[in-house]
A protein has these predicted regions:
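Small cysteine-rich, disulfide-bonded extracellular modules of the LU/uPAR three-finger superfamily
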Residues: 1-141, 148-188
């Protein structure tokens, strides 16, 4: 007879690392900065010490949990069975907090396609690079990953994956910001 551990489960943890760089420092380190692609700028910025950095942890959403449960069902043939991390949304209302029931950020004011995604089987790293021309004039203090363009949240395939709040970063044309979101899946 097979035995099962009824107390076992899976744990989701999200860690967000934010690094802010001064544009002048990046241009000094990489004189060809303006000619680099977004992916190359992300890689280059990792080689320069940031002027500010922060690490926070987040909640993963009920929608993500339901996605995993639904996709463990062998009878599930829905097209939603194959999603990816596509967009990062940024908002300006950390004061309202986060909840696993969230379906969007509290005050989403900016969204950007994820720049790079990598996984090692148990962790997914989604990195988004905001260039000096992007998201300016905002005091970002919340973020979330989306399974598609958040402008299409009425589509069942597009949902908020995680939601985090952090110390506000004022985005202007003198700064770049790198947001690394690591989702870790482990046994409890």
């Amino acid at each position: 007879m097979d035995s099962r551990n009824a107390d076992s489960g899976i744990s989701f943890q999200g860690r967000i690392d934010r690094k802010t760089h001064e544009l002048g420092h990046l241009k000094t380190a990489f004189p060809q900065w303006e000619q680099l692609s977004k992916e190359e700028k992300l890689d280059a910025s990792r080689k320069v010490k940031p002027v500010a950095e922060d690490t926070v942890y987040n909640v993963t959403t009920d929608s993500l949990h339901e996605y995993f449960v639904d996709n463990l069902d062998p009878d599930n043939t829905n097209t939603e069975a194959n999603i990816s991390v596509d967009f990062l949304g940024l908002g300006t209302d950390a004061g309202s907090g986060t909840s696993t029931a969230d379906t969007d950020l509290n005050s989403r004011v900016f969204e950007e396609p994820v720049t790079d995604v990598a996984d090692n089987g148990k962790e997914l790293l989604a990195s988004t690079f905001l260039d000096s021309t992007e998201g300016n004039g905002n005091d970002f203090d919340e973020l979330g990953l989306f399974s598609g363009d958040p402008a299409n949240l009425t589509n069942a395939e597009v949902f908020l994956i995680n939601h985090a709040t952090f110390a506000a970063v004022t985005k202007d044309s003198t700064k770049t910001v790198t947001l690394d979101v690591t989702l870790t899946f482990s046994d409890v």
